[in-house]
């Protein structure tokens, strides 16, 4: 169970880190913004799966 807790904490940190990076993307760099949004969506999906598994 400790491994899942560690993995969950790391996933939460990764989501927060990507959210912060997305906030400071230059307005003229749409390609970077799209890439960060896709990565953030994937990280959020992974976080949701980990939370569901952790609660089970």
Model-derived features: positions:
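Short, charge/polar-rich alpha-helical segments
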Residues: 1-13, 28, 35
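Short intrinsically disordered terminal tails
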Residues: 1-3, 52-56
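Non-transmembrane amphipathic alpha-helical segments
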Residues: 11-25, 43, 47-50
